[in-house]
Amino acid sequence: MAKISVMGTGSWGTALAILLHNNGHQVMLWSAHPEKAASLNQTREDPKKLPGIKIPDGIVITGDEKTALDSPDIVVFASPSAYMRAISKRLSPLIRRGQIIVNVAKGVEENTLMPVCDIIKEEIPQADVCVLSGPSHAEEVSRGLPTTCVVSA
């Protein structure tokens, strides 16, 4: 069982947190917005992003990045690509050397056209970064439907 922190409570981050939890991992889900973390903790559902999908009680939800990054084996970056540089800068001091970061955000940075994984590598040089991508949808993953993804470093 791995300790995994998913950084981002959008549909993709939440769906992956549920999948990882259902596969026996210890999962923490972090929101950059403490009020959203509090709401998700109370309702255990995000009706705007994943209506009808319950977040299992075993997933810890926090709005505190220090708590989320205290000791995970793997960190999943699931924030939108438009915010990835700011999130990476914010979290960089809390990421240890050799920490595994799995980027699941798609796209490029608007002003530089840099792929998201390159932004993370630039802002968090002490981490080992890989990318998970494929033809999948958060709604399907959250319901446990089959999908295909690959990881590349």
Language-model regions, residue ranges each:
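NAD(P)+-binding Rossmann beta1-loop-alpha1 motif at the extreme N-terminus of oxidoreductases
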Residues: 1-51, 60-63, 90
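Residue-level signal for pocket-adjacent positions within structured domains
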Residues: 35, 44-50, 54-56, 103, ...
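Rossmann-like NAD(P)(H) cofactor-binding subdomain of soluble oxidoreductases
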Residues: 62-70, 74-146, 153
